[in-house]
Curated annotation (Swiss-Prot):
InterPro entries: Csa (IPR007595), Csa_sf (IPR038641). It is a single-pass membrane protein. This is Uncharacterized protein SAS2374. Its main location: membrane. It comes from Staphylococcus aureus (strain MSSA476). The keyword Transmembrane helix applies. GO terms for cellular component: plasma membrane. The chain crosses the membrane at residues 7-27. Belongs to the staphylococcal tandem lipoprotein family. It holds the Pfam family DUF576.
Length: 273
């Protein structure tokens, strides 16, 4: 009888320990997920910034990577990427380098065409396993919230496309991000990197805005993937990107990418060109 009581007590003790450990792990995971979501939310608060000139007066995260007196440079990038039925992956994107020191903005409109390497080699491949065949860059500047090509463009349609280009940060809105539910949130402390994925509906405001501006050849509602790397508390050498993926498979890919980053001015790729 005494042995039976000790056995029962031992089992209860083990179960109690398991419950406590499980609770601690769950609490830690929930806290980390909340921190990741809050980290993304700090960036998403920039959406919308309708007037790009406002970035001249916006302060971003600063650390020891910034030299004394450097006000920093904002890098904004938006692009639509479409590949249909095994054809080339075609992209149209723009990147601007908004220098707060000089209060000048330069960048490129990029028309890209990417095909798979038939032999499967890994040279010059991007993150989705494609090699870049044709990238045409058109230099631009931004003045008074207007995009201006800095070299003559004979194609009038292309010129208008560039001049009328709007970045996602100018019209996107994540005011309800804190209410997003059922996200797949992950964290890799070794890199470190972190991400959050959400299934959206076609009724989502941001999706309606994308469909209004782009001819998206699918009715499928996309997933929103938020990706970041660097210290969760903030890092000027880290990055945060968002991607709306409508279709992704071996033969067909349709996705929109966007990023807004704040970096030391001397580290911007445009300045080094």
């Amino acid at each position: 009888m005494m042995h039976s009581k000790k056995l029962t007590l031992g089992i209860c003790l083990v179960l109690l320990i398991i419950l406590i450990v499980g609770y601690v792990i769950m609490t830690k995971a929930n806290g980390q997920n909340a921190q990741i979501k809050d980290t993304f939310n700090q960036t998403l608060k920039l959406y919308p910034t309708k007037n790009l000139d406002d970035f001249y007066d916006k302060e971003g995260f600063r650390d020891q990577e910034f030299k004394k007196g450097d006000k920093g440079t904002w890098i904004v990038n938006s692009g639509m990427n479409i590949q249909l039925k095994g054809g080339a992956l075609k992209s149209r994107e723009m990147v601007l380098y908004i220098n707060r020191n000089t209060r000048t903005t330069k960048g490129y409109f990029i028309v890209g065409e990417i095909t798979k390497d038939k032999k499967g080699y890994t040279h010059d491949k991007d993150k989705k396993g494609y090699t870049h065949d044709k990238d045409k860059k058109y230099p631009v500047k931004m003045e008074h919230n207007k995009i201006i090509p800095t070299k003559p463009i004979k194609d009038e349609k292309l010129k208008k496309e560039i001049e009328n280009f709007k970045f996602f940060v100018q019209y996107g809105n994540f005011k309800d991000f804190k209410d997003y539910k059922n996200g797949d949130i992950s964290y890799n402390p070794n890199v470190p990197s972190y991400s959050a994925k959400y299934q959206l509906s076609n009724d989502d405001y941001n999706i309606q805005q994308l469909r209004k501006r782009y001819d998206i050849p699918t009715k499928k509602a996309p997933e929103l993937l938020l990706k970041g790397d660097g210290d969760l508390k903030g890092s000027s050498i880290g990055s945060k990107d968002l991607e709306f993926t409508f279709v992704q498979n071996k033969r067909e890919n349709i996705y929109f990418t966007d990023s807004v980053e704040f970096t030391p001015s001397e580290d911007t790729s445009y300045e080094s060109n």
